[in-house]
């Protein structure tokens, strides 16, 4: 905490913490979600295991806050205080309809979490070591109630921005199919690496049909392209996390260097074309997930007869095309037109 903290360092630490916390909490569901559902149907006594995924998804705020504290080299008490405030403000835990208990509702609002985590971090930096002897009894309640309370109060406002953005995107649904799918794929490729939740936008505009399919393909293109671009400079686990978990792990990096989205946007546009040509479908509930948990491919296959041909088509459009176009555009912008460098994709996590 004695190091000089610049605005850039502060912003990057907060965004990196939110990004890493999001991915860590979503990866269990992405890898095991469908498997645990299947196990629960075969062995009802093990159905409770699916609850672990629901809880993990709801803990993004807590995990992100603690990770942000680690990035700032805070003490455990300070880090957990940020986590508690961020979890409370994010809205993933809400009262039951009869107000007698609590229930989990999704993963919470990422924008609200960023705001609250930044506020809580600034609060702890302001206090510094003044409360050192009483930190255990002062910091957690003050940060949770005051900072978390402010964050929770702003939750409806930040959630409303998602709806406003959704209303703007909704106008695209009246365009010609190929133009529609290209734009939707590119927009969702951007949304998934932004503080805005792509799933929330998809639900807000009730996106379905080929528009939903294009949204998922855009996210697939984003995940695979970022993994390919960072293959030489990041660990293999981090690369895989981009499409198995969420591309949001690169959110802070993209905010710092927006130009690294060039290959992603081009790859998403190509995938969007194939969404229209091959009639790739989806639903409002599936749009926004992409390849994570195989939600996108499974949602499309649910609209087909499930034949071997349809399975092959899904594999081509959800994996082969994003990977091939990702390789092409990464090489284009790093070798042929050297606008970006592989080092630009390095994540310091």
Indicate where each model-derived feature is located.
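Pore-lining transmembrane helices
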Residues: 1-349
